[in-house]
Amino acid sequence: MKRVILHIDMDAFFAQVEQVKNPALRGKPIIVGGDAGHRGVVATCSYEARKYGIHSAMSSAEARRRCPHAIFVGGNLTNYVYISAQIQDIMNDYTPIVEPTSIDEAYLDITESYHLYGTPEKLAQDLKDNIKKRLQLTCTVGIAENKLLAKTASDMNKPDGLNTLWMNELEEKFFPMEIRKLRGVGPQTEKALKRLGINTLRDLKDYPEKKLSQNFGLHGEHLSKMAHGLSDTPVHSFEEMEDEKSMSHEHTLYEDTSDLIFLKSLMITLTDKVVARLKKAQFLAKTVRLKIRYSDFSTITREVTLNSMTDDVNTIYKTALTLLPVDDVVSNKVRLVGVGVTKLHEAVETPQIELFEESSISKKGKSGDVVEDIRDKFGKFSIVRASSLPYRWEH
């Protein structure tokens, strides 16, 4: 049975909420963020302001220069969170499987419920109408068979849009797209792909996966899969996340940063903490997750399921690294990083190894056990990885 996934994206959410609160602001260029005279930045802006090239994370001074008659609003995060909760309540009326990814975006799995409305499109339109009727807010909805395509579909038709991107529509709608439109392809990856003669998603789809892997490592395999429109990441409701056995550690940075060396060293520290808990609880993990929250409070969560269960710190860390959206991190400062593992099972048996063959995994496992013994006896900072020192110097 094919999945049916919605991606809901509230249109210029903060600005819309301000316009609902003060109807005199409707139709005007609204900028939510710090005042231009106090080194502020744009949190978001109305579509009227976007016509002047204004966007999130732009300095307020530059925004003022581009649109001198723009109206700056300080914003009210408490009110935005309250309205966001009301939107989620409405979404929960259509399916219990709702995964918010930020204050103004969410994925819904409507595989089991869309038939109550006849078609996925009719359910999506009813949801849009309901949000507009109850809250006077518009949103854009993308409909597809997976999260990747649903998000892409919503990006195609903003604002106040409804768009599908089924597998049989890829030839017409998806493959002709420029590679920079693919989620996870930022400026640096785009340049590298174009050097290989890859300019569109069709080019990327047709490029040999083996060569992509040679150029981009594990990320190359991921790029090839996405270029074919494939993604098997499930929609996780809060209830599922709470019920699922998992362990994770997060860290909110004192100052937002795009420093990759710092972020990677922080990921090592977080992975160490997760693995220490795994070993202490005698669990093995099958799935690795990475969580990134940017300075604008948008959040992404990526995960990958391994071929076998593990509690090996190197395996988990290297897997988490493949999930790091390097280009996005470089262009958008990060405020929070989280590393986690799920699908846990008790480590009842020792993994079987080939007779007469030295196992590198076995050696790594033994060294990891020794490290944990030392930490238990002398403290968690008695032995650390050299590569995590850039992060530890800050603490």
Segments predicted by a language model, with ranges:
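Gly/Gly-Pro- and Ser/Thr-rich, intrinsically disordered tail segments characteristic of DNA damage-repair
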Residues: 1-225, 238, 361-395
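DNA-contacting surface of Y-family translesion DNA polymerases
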Residues: 7, 181, 191-333
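A glycine-rich phosphate-binding loop feature that marks nucleotide/adenosyl-phosphate handling sites
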Residues: 145-148, 229, 284-294, 336-345, ...
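Acidic, metal-coordinating catalytic segment for phosphate/diphosphate chemistry
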Residues: 308-395
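Short, hydrophobic beta-strand segments
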Residues: 106-112, 301-304, 351-357
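Active-site-proximal helix-loop elements at catalytic-domain edges
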Residues: 1-8, 100, 245, 340-350
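Short, charged/polar surface micro-motifs in flexible loops or helix N-caps
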Residues: 13, 36-39, 295-298, 344-347
